[in-house]
Amino acid sequence: LIFYSAVFGVLSRRGGHRCKEGESMNAALRRDADVILRSSLNAVLPDEAVRRALRDLRPGKGRVLLVAAGKAAWQMAHAAVETLGRVDGGVVVTKYGHVKGEIPGVTCYEAGHPVPDANGFAATQKALELVQGLTAGDTVLFLLSGGGSALFEQPLVPGAELQDITSQLLASGADIVEMNTIRKRLSGVKGGRFAQRCAPAQVFSIVLSDILGDPLDMIASGPAVPDTSTCAQALAVAERYHLALSAQARALLAQETPKTLDNVTTRITGSVRELCRAAASACRNLGYEPVLLTDQLCCEAREAGSFLGSIVRTQAGQGKKLAYIAGGETIVHLTGKGLGGRNQELALAAAPAIAGLNAAVFSVGSDGTDGPTDAAGGYVDGDTLAALEAGGWSGYAALQNNDSYHALKAVDGLIITGATGTNVNDVAVALIGEKTPPVSPEVSPEW
């Protein structure tokens, strides 16, 4: 199911959709989901946010250089150069497939994510060469978005070892704060070290947040922010997840990062809170009564899906359209060998609870990427469980094998957007149609 293309149009449909003759009762919910996702993602595209933040820029009398890193780096850099008119040089490093064209005065690179690669190392080196030898009158415009931890990297251990440590962290179930606490100490640019390399030039940093609570030193591992994490915390993370580390890596974890920086001004723009509010507004425009459950969701993906499914069952039967919205970033502990992502797992886990109901649950990553797949997330409704069983699929077995991608693909439940140009965590929505009857609380199926 392709809900929308990578180029978004502004939608303003109101009142929701009604089922057409001969359609499943959930067909209208699927169309509503399309509108909600379009509207939500349009609201957090970085272009206008960058333009607003640049109103506070007071460049010195010297050169203005641009460095942008992350999944939204190209869009942020494009908006910045359009706004400023020109820059005296620049480097963009973003994920493969995310460069949309040339930007005057700026060299664009694509690199690996979520595991860093040689292209990212080379692009980061170009950025470091760009900011060498600056004066106090120069200004570095630093545009940062999620994904920068992998894309913007100068490893202090051999590149292959850094890739292995990153893969260990991704598979461990460590949250993003724990992961970045380790990454900072193995890098020549993270944890405030990039800003140190720019001194004495002033760094004006615009940050698109992809971490709950917007902790600046953790977004893309904080290349231009004093680090609040400690060596003791880094060593504790390594111990907690039994990371296999070389003696060199362990020694780096014991070295402190910069705790003060006097050459940086930071503006944060865009967050999961804005994404959730936009989803609520879109739901309201379609005739739903929206409830924002949280914008700090950070549990296991399948638990979040089961929770949303249980809300549907307990709130069904009110004779009106209801929407429950949760934003954040769930985690997945990899135990199987299948293919999927946290948003796909969340959606699939909700399927048994809403089976047979006029209801839907969908979850999407705002950057258009969910795990190592071409999908942004997943969609299920009251018809999904029956469709899986008719196709010979066990949803439970798919979850146990972390194979939500293939299960959802079999029932037309993948959400595919392509690169969206933004990155502000994930949003999950449960929709309850007005045709849903009351459900007995004693019957609550789950996998």
What positions do the PLM features span?
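Short, Lys/Arg-enriched N-terminal segments with co-localized hydrophobic residues
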Residues: 2-7, 11-24
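Short beta-strand segments
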Residues: 67-69, 91-94, 141-146, 205-211, ...
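A glycine- and small-aliphatic-rich helix-loop capping segment at beta-alpha/alpha-beta transitions
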Residues: 79-89, 103-108, 128, 132, ...
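Glycine-rich oxoanion-binding loops at beta->alpha junctions
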Residues: 94-137, 178, 182-183
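Internal gly/pro-rich beta-alpha loop/helix module
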Residues: 158-244
